[in-house]
Curated annotation (Swiss-Prot):
Catalyzed reactions per annotation: Thiol-dependent hydrolysis of ester, thioester, amide, peptide and isopeptide bonds formed by the C-terminal Gly of ubiquitin (a 76-residue protein attached to proteins as an intracellular targeting signal)
Active site: 165, 628
Descriptive protein name: Ubiquitin carboxyl-terminal hydrolase 33
Domain USP, residue spans: 156-670
Domain of life: Eukaryota
Recorded name of the encoding gene: usp33
Bias (Low complexity) ranges: 398-411, 875-884
Biased composition (Polar residues): 287-297, 355-396
Species this chain originates from: Danio rerio (Zebrafish)
SMART domains linked to this entry: DUSP (SM00695), ZnF_UBP (SM00290)
Protein's job: Deubiquitinating enzyme involved in various processes such as centrosome duplication, cellular migration and beta-2 adrenergic receptor/ADRB2 recycling. Involved in regulation of centrosome duplication by mediating deubiquitination of ccp110 in S and G2/M phase, leading to stabilize ccp110 during the period which centrioles duplicate and elongate. Involved in cell migration via its interaction with intracellular domain of robo1, leading to regulate the Slit signaling.
Gene Ontology cellular component annotations, sorted alphabetically: centrosome; perinuclear region of cytoplasm
Length: 897
């Protein structure tokens, strides 16, 4: 095709003859300089030039070629859009590529990607957005091509660099979790952080090396190991460590570095979030549980209200049957249902008085504001923070576990109930919620309920978990668990007898007799049933009821409210006493496919997929004091099992895996419907129907569509700001964040999953740019003024008064003015460093405080407010001043004499 449209680009006359077949053939080629393949290859359109080069996503050899040869026109072989380097704009050619290839022409109806006030500039310029690439069937097709067995990716070993088998086994197990690995391989634009030691970049490099096509025999994970040691000193040195503790430390740090703000829906009628600085309830259970901060990771993006369950939930099962016809109890049932459903909004810890007539109002912050006629209904809000990595072995791990709570009937599995008064002052600083690929893949929710058997008051706790630490039941415990399946009352009360429903009396008796001769046969289902079993709180473990104000007998159970995409199960094989440690060597049999979690779900759970297949398992050989870690992993490409023993990678049979002494297991949701959906979308891509609109979709969500059993609603918020534009800080690499798909594919995905918002036009948000400039100006002014005032304070020899300020608040303010934190710190809070003595507020001894001048205090207080004022006097007092004057007077008198 020669010539061309009525375009004002004078360089179109230089276009040579080119056919549709030639463009298609070039699109399957590679860059002539760096040999990288597509997509995003650019072909030179100069007459007689056949050059094909890579774009900005690689070395941008197409631009280099244009600069060296002065060939101005180039065409993107993926989108077939034409760019003129001389005119610095997109131009259009009149071409006839056939009816099935009209997708590129449809781009004519779509405005080029540009800012609202300017044309598209030269690719790569700071003020422009490079046109994102169009998606192909390869971008969404999960059908892996058949590879040569000797060249299968993902079979690279890890070198042991000094007792690091615990790390190598954990890394190989994580590496074979497709949702996480594909994120680091395909969503590189999101792997950015300014936090040290940038562990996410080291992990991304490691994953790239492990799954490279030209794989090496092994990789040395030095950079990642150095980063872990910088995060947690426990891993320094060359002593053997716990593999599960390493996993928690690694995933916590990855979450911190990759977390992004969850956009808050604008709701003018939202309830005011309550203060979340709770006092601890006086429970008889030990305070040894901390939940992870990933409550902020709730990624429900649909706009529908909470689903009303058809069946009653587990909390209702605890109530006396004779009261179910009572009108007050019916109101309370509705309240408890709402409290259960609040789990999708965050981690909550609530006490419900079963005689109150309260109605919960769920705020956008995940808190619940109760309105009722009774004053003894209290709501508990969990103060949930992601735990720091453990500093010891199993004994400490149980206290820092992100697993759900249990009572002391199973060791080291108790909950902490924290409460606040009904109405508390509102916090000025917004409590932001965050999510990351870690929280999206591994976070689930547990609902735990405790009922007082005297007043029927129910305490409901919703907490997020990242892994579940399961006890290994002994012989007597197994007998109780198996026999409970034949006691209907216990099943109704919330026990997990459903897990053993198919077992009859004869099978139970035979298995029980067999266990006396050959030892108990423990299954993973037994461990789960033991964890979720109902517990009676009595004797030394009575429940402290807030309504009765006494220790009462109670009943406690927990269920799963929402299931994670990948379920991480930790078997508690190690017991650490004061003087010695032991290891439980009991073999726990586990399924390779079809782990069913349905018996452990809450009745009103919205989980659609409850079946899991095994991905990988970490095993420990040896004793509690010494041993060796290996991992068995299923390769996603050929579905075969391999043993990863440091540098050695060996194919093994399924029976070998099932006989392993499992320590940590990774299970992934299994859903055949998702595979069918992917194939359907692939066929829609291949149809290449003409469309007038092109849609931009988040690469991160497309990765979830490819690897998750339940990808959830479409979410484009990872590349959009609250105003619907591109945040200025993401404009430079927008091509790494989005993919352009045709209208027919978007229509199908949107009708199937919902979500959004729909995006047909990309532009840099000027509103965000103005806000950033204002914020930077404020930061600079505050920082400069503080430096000047503090310098004057340092030069002052004897200040009359010195003001104290909480270092906790000061660090938050410092993070804000240095650009590390987005939001201002809120009002000054000196309550933790102040103590009231005889009506006077003074500095608390040993308080974490700093000293500033009166001028500095007034400056900060005028901007942020808060208090109280805490001052200290300098050591030179008025008394000492009077004494010095007396001495001078005596000296004068002496001289006179």
């Amino acid at each position: 095709m020669s010539g061309v449209s009525s375009n004002d680009c004078p360089h179109l006359e230089c276009v040579g003859e080119i056919t549709k077949e030639e463009l298609i053939q070039k699109s399957h080629g590679q860059c002539q300089d760096c040999k990288v393949g597509g997509p995003n290859l650019w072909a030179c359109l100069e007459n007689g030039c056949s050059y094909v080069g890579c774009g900005e996503s690689h070395a941008d050899h197409s631009t280099v070629h244009s600069q060296e040869t002065r060939h101005n026109l180039t065409v993107n072989l993926t989108t077939l859009r034409v760019w003129c380097y001389a005119c610095t704009k997109e131009v259009f050619l009149e071409r006839k590529l056939g009816p099935h290839k009209q997708l590129p022409n449809a781009a004519k109806a779509v405005s080029p990607v540009q800012t609202p006030c300017q044309d598209l500039n030269t690719p790569g310029s700071p003020t422009s957005l490079r046109v994102p690439s169009a998606g192909t069937c390869d971008d969404l097709d999960m059908e892996t091509e058949e590879e040569d067995e000797l060249r299968t990716r993902g079979l690279t070993g890890l070198k042991n660099i000094g007792n690091t088998c615990y790390m190598n086994a954990a890394l190989q197990a994580l590496s074979n979790c497709p949702p996480l690995t594909q994120f680091f391989l395909e969503c590189g634009g999101l792997v950015k952080t300014d936090k040290k030691p940038a562990l996410c970049k080291s992990y991304q490099k490691l994953i790239t090396d492990l799954w490279h096509k030209n794989r090496n025999a092994y990789v040395v994970p030095t950079n990642l190991f150095q980063g872990i040691k910088a995060v947690n000193p426990m891993f320094r040195g060359y002593s053997q460590q716990d593999s599960q503790e390493f996993l928690r430390c690694l995933m916590d740090q990855l979450h911190e570095e990759l977390k992004e703000l969850i956009p808050e829906p604008e709701d003018p009628n939202q309830a005011v979030a309550m203060d979340d600085s709770p006092d601890e309830d006086n429970h008889s259970q030990s305070d040894d549980f901390q939940s992870c901060e990933s409550c902020g990771s709730s990624d429900r993006a649909d706009n529908e209200g909470p689903r009303v369950p058809e069946d009653i939930n587990e909390a209702e099962m605890l109530m006396p049957e004779q009261n179910q016809n009572n009108r007050d109890w019916q109101k309370e049932k509705n309240l408890i249902n709402n409290l259960y459903r609040a789990g999708s909004h965050g981690d909550l810890d609530k006490d419900v008085d079963t005689t109150s007539d309260s109605r919960p109002i769920i705020s956008s912050q995940g808190a619940i504001k109760a309105q009722g006629r009774t004053s003894d209904s209290e709501i508990q809000v969990s103060s949930t923070v992601r735990p720091q990595s453990p500093t010891g072995n199993e004994g400490i791990t149980s206290r820092l576990s992100s697993s759900p709570p249990k009572s002391s009937a199973w060791p080291n599995l108790s909950s902490t109930h924290k409460k606040v008064p009904m109405f508390t002052p509102t916090k000025t600083k917004r409590q932001r919620k965050y999510h990351s690929i870690i929280s999206e893949v591994f976070d689930g929710t547990i609902v735990s309920s405790v009922q007082c058997l005297t007043c029927d008051r129910v305490s409901v706790t919703l907490e997020n978990f990242q892994d579940i630490s399961l006890p290994i039941p002994g012989k007597e415990d197994l007998a109780k668990l198996h026999s409970s399946s034949h006691q209907t009352a216990l099943v109704k009360a919330g026990s997990c007898g459903e897990a053993y429903a198919p077992q009859g009396w004869i099978a139970f008796v035979m298995e029980y007799i067999k266990s006396w001769f050959w030892g108990p046969v423990v299954t993973l289902q037994d461990c789960l049933a033991a964890f979720f079993a109902r517990d009676e709180l009595k004797g030394d473990n009575m429940y402290s009821c807030e309504k009765c104000k006494k220790l009462r007998n109670g009943v406690k159970f927990c269920k799963v409210q929402s299931l994670p995409e990948i379920l991480c199960i930790h078997l508690k094989r190690f017991r650490h006493e004061l003087m010695f440690s032991t290891k439980i060597g009991t073999h726990v049999s586990f399924p390779l496919e079809g782990l069913e979690m349905q018996p452990f779900l809450a009745k009103d759970s919205s989980a659609l997929t409850t079946t899991y297949d095994l991905l990988s398992v970490i095993c420990h050989h040896g004793t509690a004091s010494s041993g060796h870690y290996i991992a068995y992993c299923r390769n996603e490409l050929n579905q075969l099992w391999y043993e990863f023993d440091d540098q050695s990678v060996t194919e093994v049979s399924e029976s070998c895996v099932q006989n392993a002494e499992a320590y940590v297991l990774f299970y992934k949701k299994s859903n055949d419907e998702t595979q069918k959906e992917r194939r359907k979308v692939t066929s829609l891509f291949n149809m290449m129907e003409p469309s007038l609109l092109q849609f931009y979709v988040s690469r991160q969500w497309l990765n979830k569509f490819k690897t998750f059993a339940e990808p959830g609603p479409i979410s484009n918020h990872d590349f959009l700001c609250a105003h619907g534009g591109i945040p200025p800080n993401k404009a430079a690499y927008i091509d790494d964040l989005v993919l352009m798909i045709p209208q027919n594919v978007w229509d199908h995905l949107y009708s199937r999953y919902g979500g959004g918002p729909a995006v047909n036009h990309l532009y840099v948000c000027h509103t965000c740019q103005n806000e950033i400039e204002k914020l930077e100006k404020r930061r600079k002014n505050e920082l400069d003024m503080f430096v000047r005032l503090n310098k004057a304070f340092q030069e002052e020899e004897s200040p009359v008064v010195i003001y104290c300020i909480s270092m906790q608040w000061f660090r938050e303010w410092e993070s804000f003015v240095k650009g590390k934190d987005i939001d201002p710190p809120g009002p000054i809070d000196n309550s933790k460093i102040a103590v009231n003595k005889n009506g006077h507020i003074t500095l608390k001894p040993g308080a974490d405080s700093g000293q500033i001048s009166e001028e500095t205090w007034n400056f900060l207080h005028n901007i942020h407010g808060g208090g109280p004022v805490v001052t200290v006097r300098p050591s030179v007092s008025h008394q000492e001043s009077e004494t010095s004057q007396s001495e001078e007077k005596i000296e004068v008198e002496t001289r006179t004499v």
